[in-house]
């Protein structure tokens, strides 16, 4: 069933870093009636994320960086352990995933596998994230990583079992990273 909307009005609220619009519209209900709704929609573009793993060592490579929204919402340090990720800009999802792996971790990986894509916060954000995994090897590290421009990213290599345990004990809070770790676990890629 597709939603039927009419009388859509769009108002620009902000275009400082990304774009925030207010939409007012009439939504046809399944009972035949309609209701007027208002939603603010944040458009930051689409992105890609990639989880690097090493079967032989039983490890994954993550990044640790400051994320202001987590700080505002109770994360005292603002630091977040996560799979590397970035916005597509003009790149394809795979190109973006590869670019972010090099920029953030220093690894220039070989084969990359797209595993799925998902809306991460569909109640207010347009962004679709493309999820990738890639096996890494120590000889594929061509740079230190750490990000670009004003990024200050720590590269963290962890045992896969510890990363999964961090989900259960609450230390792993990044949704995209949890999804990718569970993908490896469900598909027994690290066995």
From Swiss-Prot:
It catalyses: GDP-alpha-D-mannose + H2O = alpha-D-mannose 1-phosphate + GMP + 2 H(+). It comes from Serratia proteamaculans (strain 568). Residues 43-180 form the Nudix hydrolase domain. Belongs to the Nudix hydrolase family. NudK subfamily. Pfam families: NUDIX. GDP-alpha-D-mannose binds at residues 38-40, 67, 85-87, 104, 127, 150-151, 176. NCBIfam families: nudix-type nucleoside diphosphatase, YffH/AdpP family (TIGR00052), PRK15009.1 (NF011585). InterPro entries: NDP_pyrophosphatase (IPR004385), NUDIX_hydrolase-like_dom_sf (IPR015797), NUDIX_hydrolase_dom (IPR000086). Keywords: Hydrolase, Magnesium, Metal-binding. GO terms for molecular function: hydrolase activity, acting on acid anhydrides, in phosphorus-containing anhydrides; metal ion binding. The lineage of its organism: Bacteria, Pseudomonadati, Pseudomonadota, Gammaproteobacteria, Enterobacterales. Its cofactor is Mg(2+). Disulfide bonds: none annotated. Mg(2+) 1 binds at residues 85, 104. Coiled coil: none annotated. The gene is nudK. One of its GO terms (cellular component) is cytosol. This is GDP-mannose pyrophosphatase. One of its GO terms (biological process) is ribose phosphate metabolic process. In the dimer, the N-terminal domains are swapped between the two monomers, such that residues of both chains contribute to the active site. Nucleoside diphosphate sugar hydrolase that hydrolyzes GDP-mannose as its preferred substrate, yielding GMP and mannose-1-phosphate. Mg(2+) 2 binds at residues 100, 104, 151. A motif (Nudix box) lies at residues 86-106.
